[in-house]
């Protein structure tokens, strides 16, 4: 697709040749014609990177015949819809920070990082509606962040001009987004993008790129892939991350070609040893790659004739969730191992995404990557001082604000996505039961993990003393508002999965206890158990409300909820909703009447 640029604020004396010469002098040669009008002109660039370079180099910076020219994307009003481009983003900015910033102005359907040779980052953002994109344009234009000023443009939204295929969701129908599909797509049409990320020695980066980029262009052309070499990340590092986007076959072929280039370069520079293949993989997927008692890894080693090692868990942090899988062997052997390793990682990733999407149907608008709860949804721009300086796996996975989830399950009067704009929500206490052997993983070394988790969630998290020497479960006491409960419980479920406390193919199911006023227990059960049965059918959680339980000193009884994370969360919220309704009725009606109505 051509990138049409608008050149404005031109003097009447400017000619097409003037513009060609100016662009040429700035090493921005124009291949096509210059369409010159009175006071403005249009030019085309076939490549988005060249278009960005022209905007950044010329707009507001270059004078021609006494006037400072303006350069931007040429987007007709008809195509100014949901898509914007943000430039001049600090290169070290973490995705979570950008998440939060973008989410303030609406539901973000997609963010894709543009692979440019500029020092700063560029992203293309798609909002759910035209109005949200317009607000983001107005609010973020010129936004200052650490001495960087954001530059924002509309980019064409092809969805507006193209006719809608029959299967496309109509305006107002959010089903395609809720299922994680691109707008207008189907589950078959959209393949999950799971890139291969590898580390290459810095001294081989030049050889992989080649003179004037010819080698890397040849790789991408032959394999139909996109290869991002993050050579500007973490200057001085011994290794640089490379991200390869393609089909599984294209990814493996591109990886093989890169391995061959590195080995050839090593041979020519008299480096004796074989160059290992180093694959970066999220810790949440690595357990399933290894397999029970290491069987999967041993099988790959045996079949490919390689030696495979995986970096220590101690290298991980909440901001650096990746581990390094080092494969040693011949180029052919390493390439074969890469195919098998990626097959396992991709399968684990797709299973996780399937589970997320199935449960997210219960929770409209939910996307976990916005909260960073589950491993496979987590994409970050690494901190500048990270151990590997690894950049994000682009294109950035679609994410939305979590306001859709909270607005559907939490009453609006409690809080919005930004609690400081509202009255403080009520503190809730949830007791979550985890396997005894998982306590160390939740606490972390010298309590580091549990403190980090409490800060992230904005909750108080304590592990109750064991009730006896041989108990199989321990109680985690979580105190905080609804959003904090969601984050804290989600991270605990995710941690248990990552650390292999449950079988790779097994869902993490935990028991949670919440206390409700004894006077509302009957309402939670419903007539003949109707309400609790409906609740279980809706949420897939097991909900147990003991009828003969003696209330505690606060006249409260315990409701037990057993299920996976989404099931448990939905059940907790629905039960709280019932309790809230009863409280409102008690405030509305005299005491005697309220109790009669609740029976």
Curated annotation (Swiss-Prot):
It is found in: Nucleus; Cytoplasm; Cytoplasm, P-body; Cytoplasm, Stress granule. PANTHER family: KH DOMAIN CONTAINING RNA BINDING PROTEIN. Keywords: Acetylation, Cytoplasm, mRNA transport, Nucleus, Phosphoprotein, Repeat, RNA-binding, Translation regulation, Transport. RNA-binding factor that recruits target transcripts to cytoplasmic protein-RNA complexes (mRNPs). This transcript 'caging' into mRNPs allows mRNA transport and transient storage. It also modulates the rate and location at which target transcripts encounter the translational apparatus and shields them from endonuclease attacks or microRNA-mediated degradation. Preferentially binds to N6-methyladenosine (m6A)-containing mRNAs and increases their stability. Binds to the 5'-UTR of the insulin-like growth factor 2 (IGF2) mRNAs. Binding is isoform-specific. GO terms for biological process: anatomical structure morphogenesis; cold-induced thermogenesis; CRD-mediated mRNA stabilization; energy homeostasis; mRNA transport; negative regulation of translation; nervous system development; regulation of cytokine production. It comes from Homo sapiens (Human). Residues 170-180 have a biased composition (Basic and acidic residues). Pfam families: KH_1, RRM_1. Domains KH3 and KH4 are the major RNA-binding modules, although KH1 and KH2 may also contribute. The contribution to RNA-binding of individual KH domains may be target-specific. KH1 and KH2, and possibly KH3 and KH4, promote the formation of higher ordered protein-RNA complexes, which may be essential for IGF2BP1 cytoplasmic retention. KH domains are required for RNA-dependent homo- and heterooligomerization and for localization to stress granules. Expressed in oocytes, granulosa cells of small and growing follicles, Leydig cells, spermatogonia and semen (at protein level). Expressed in testicular cancer (at protein level). Expressed weakly in heart, placenta, skeletal muscle, bone marrow, colon, kidney, salivary glands, testis and pancreas. Detected in fetal liver, fetal ovary, gonocytes and interstitial cells of the testis. Residues 3-76, 82-157 form the RRM domain. The keyword Acetylation applies. It comes from the Eukaryota. Belongs to the RRM IMP/VICKZ family. This is Insulin-like growth factor 2 mRNA-binding protein 2.
């Amino acid at each position: 697709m051509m990138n049409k640029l608008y050149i404005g604020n031109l003097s009447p004396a400017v000619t097409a040749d003037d513009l060609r010469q100016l662009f040429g002098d700035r090493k921005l040669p124009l291949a096509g014609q210059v369409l010159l009008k009175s006071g403005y002109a249009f030019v085309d660039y076939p490549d988005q990177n060249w278009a960005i370079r022209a905007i950044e180099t010329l707009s507001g910076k270059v004078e021609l015949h006494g006037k400072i020219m303006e350069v931007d994307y040429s987007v007709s009003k008809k195509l100014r819809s949901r898509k914007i481009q943000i430039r001049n983003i600090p290169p070290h900015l973490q995705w979570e920070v950008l998440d939060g910033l973008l989410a303030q102005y609406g539901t973000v359907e997609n963010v894709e990082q543009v692979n440019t040779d500029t020092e700063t980052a560029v992203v293309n953002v798609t909002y759910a509606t035209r109005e949200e994109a317009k607000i983001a344009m107005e609010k973020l234009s010129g936004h200052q962040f650490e001495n960087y000023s954001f530059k924002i443009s509309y980019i064409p939204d092809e969805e507006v001009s193209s006719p809608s295929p029959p299967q496309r969701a109509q305006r107002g129908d959010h089903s395609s987004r809720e299922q994680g599909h691109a707008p207008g797509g189907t589950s078959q049409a959209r393949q999950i993008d799971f890139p291969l990320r590898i580390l290459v020695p810095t001294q081989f980066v030049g050889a992989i790129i080649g003179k004037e980029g010819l080698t890397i262009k040849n790789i991408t052309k032959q394999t139909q892939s996109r290869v991002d070499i993050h050579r500007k990340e973490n200057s001085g590092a011994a290794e640089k991350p490379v991200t390869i986007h393609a089909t599984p076959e294209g990814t493996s072929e591109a990886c093989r070609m890169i391995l061959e280039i590195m080995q050839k370069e090593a041979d020519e520079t008299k480096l004796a040893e074989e160059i290992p293949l180093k694959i970066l993989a999220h810790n949440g997927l690595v357990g399933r790659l290894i397999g029970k008692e290491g069987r999967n890894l041993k099988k790959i080693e045996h079949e490919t004739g390689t030696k495979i090692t995986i970096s220590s868990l101690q290298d991980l942090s909440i901001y650096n969730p990746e581990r390094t899988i080092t494969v040693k062997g011949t180029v052919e052997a390493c390439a074969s191992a890469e195919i098998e390793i990626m097959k396992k990682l991709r399968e684990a990733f797709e299973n996780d995404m399937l589970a997320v999407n199935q449960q997210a149907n219960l929770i409209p608008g939910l996307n976990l990557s916005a909260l960073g709860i589950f491993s496979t949804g987590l994409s970050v721009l690494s901190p500048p001082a990270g151990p590997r300086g690894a950049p994000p796996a682009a294109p950035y996975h679609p994410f939305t604000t979590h306001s859709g989830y909270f607005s559907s399950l939490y009453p609006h009067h409690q809080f919005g996505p930004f609690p400081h704009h509202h009255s403080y929500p009520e503190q809730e206490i949830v007791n979550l039961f985890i396997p005894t052997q998982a306590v160390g993983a939740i606490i972390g070394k010298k309590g580091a993990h549990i403190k980090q988790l409490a800060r992230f969630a904005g909750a108080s998290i304590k592990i109750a003393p064991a009730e006896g020497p041989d108990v199989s479960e321990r109680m985690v006491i979580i105190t905080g508002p609804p959003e904090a409960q969601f984050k804290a419980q989600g991270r605990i479920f995710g941690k248990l999965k990552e650390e292999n406390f449950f079988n790779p193919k097994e869902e993490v199911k935990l028991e949670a206890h919440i206390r409700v006023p004894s006077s509302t227990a009957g309402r939670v059960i419903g007539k003949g158990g109707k309400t609790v049965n409906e609740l279980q059918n809706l949420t897939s959680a097991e909900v147990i409300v003991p009828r003969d339980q003696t209330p505690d000193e606060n006249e409260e009884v315990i409701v037990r909820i057993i299920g996976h994370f989404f099931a448990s969360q939905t059940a907790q919220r629905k039960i709280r909703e019932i309790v809230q309704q009863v409280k409102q009725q008690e405030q509305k009606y005299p005491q005697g009447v309220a109790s009669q109505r609740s029976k």
